[in-house]
């Protein structure tokens, strides 16, 4: 898919961080230099990687989805397709599934979230969710956010720093600049995760057989 013109400020901030000239929306549509070609070839992948890296509050989406006509060969009774940006309607394309409604049987105890007996497991395979829960399946996931106004200010700054890190050596040939931009990105990433995680109560940690044995 084409890069949204609203995301151009992030690209240009990254280019400025590594001493390169800004590019225009026209150059995103028709790349004519090294910087614009690099942006068109790699920006979306780097953005999606960073979105998947952490459950950023602005990128979390909820959807109620219906089962597929096909069923898993074994282990599970039903399969569901990831939200793809069109089905369900008006929902973001899913990059990473965080929770489904058969994984919400938790209680808040003295030591935090404690899994309760009786929950059913689920797996994500090949952009399909496998579960024993019949339609509808309620999912909470990280969506592909492509609108500049939707992104938090903190994420925009972090993404620009990630792009600067990835593009420093290809654009300037400087290993030292690549190392410095990586150092800055690592510091900003830790700060951003910490601040983002302070909004609301903490999410329960993922289910596992080890946890069930530990708390039962």
Where are these regions (language model features)?
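Glycine-enriched, solvent-exposed interface loops adjoining structured elements
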Residues: 1-216
């Amino acid at each position: 898919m084409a890069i949204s013109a609203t995301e151009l400020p992030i690209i240009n901030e990254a280019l400025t961080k590594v001493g390169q000239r800004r590019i225009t929306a026209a150059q995103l549509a028709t790349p004519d230099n090294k910087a614009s070609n690099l942006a068109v070839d790699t920006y979306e992948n780097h953005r999606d990687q960073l979105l998947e890296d952490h459950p950023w509050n602005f990128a979390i989406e909820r959807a109620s989805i219906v089962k597929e006509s096909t069923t898993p060969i074994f282990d599970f009774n039903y399969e569901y397709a990831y939200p793809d940006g069109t089905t369900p309607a008006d929902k973001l394309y899913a990059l990473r599934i965080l929770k489904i409604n058969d994984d919400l049987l938790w209680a808040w105890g003295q030591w935090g979230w404690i899994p309760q007996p009786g929950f059913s497991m689920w797996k994500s395979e090949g952009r399909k969710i496998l579960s024993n829960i019949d339609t509808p399946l309620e999912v909470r996931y990280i969506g592909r956010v492509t609108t500049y106004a939707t992104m938090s200010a903190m994420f925009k700054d972090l993404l620009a720093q990630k792009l600067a890190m990835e593009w420093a050596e290809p654009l300037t040939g400087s290993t030292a600049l690549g190392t410095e931009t990586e150092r800055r990105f690592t510091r900003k990433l830790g700060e951003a995760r910490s601040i983002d995680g302070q909004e609301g109560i903490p999410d329960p940690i993922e289910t596992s057989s080890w946890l069930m044995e530990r708390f039962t």
